[in-house]
Amino acid sequence: MSGPECCENPPTLSTGGESGDVLQIASLNSYVSGDANSKIAIVLISDVYGYGAPKLRKLADKVASAGYYVVVPDFLHGDPLIPETPIQDWLKNHGPVESVVFAKSVITALKEKGISKIGAAGFCWGAKVVVELAKEAEIQVAALLHPSFVTLDDIKGVKVSTAILGAETDKMSPPELVKEFELALKANTEIDHFVKIYSGVSHGWTVRWKDDDEIAVKCAKEAHEDLLAWFAKCL
């Protein structure tokens, strides 16, 4: 269920121009941004390229500007995918389901800090971690952006309000599958949902858009605004 799309347009893992800091949350190095006194936290879970990706950190800063305490943990333990490594080999030691226990430890640490509500957004690889948290109601609201490894049974099992942002061109979660996800969410009258497929973009565009692709840039901005609106509605 993983392929070249997960690896396209890898980020340059350089730091600088960020508003936040790297701190330790539970046992994980984490990029944190925003009001440390906020009672609402947003956890962003990266794709295979990890928590150091500049565009992911800039998105974290943007979410933080809405008044949230934003945490981007290093669930890859300092070992993000590098383009020279076959992704199937890398995944043997970096399964998203195995990261759920670490995600729960981050959530526990945030609650101990005084956080009362937690939302989570997962990108590609990270979406699987988020959906597992949503199935156990470990968070109050979920967002899955161009998800990988997420199944229809996963979506049927979520217990919190869930948004899914999909791409028109995506072999990992093609529009047909996203529409099935939407039907499953509609059938769950206990939760709210938001599903949208963005035209003209491909898997990974929300955090790995190409700067010279006007459509991808526009749709990334649109998706970011939709994500913020979703959190504002549910939190």
What are these model-predicted stretches?
Residues M1-L235:
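N-terminal cap/leader regions of alpha/beta-hydrolase-fold enzymes
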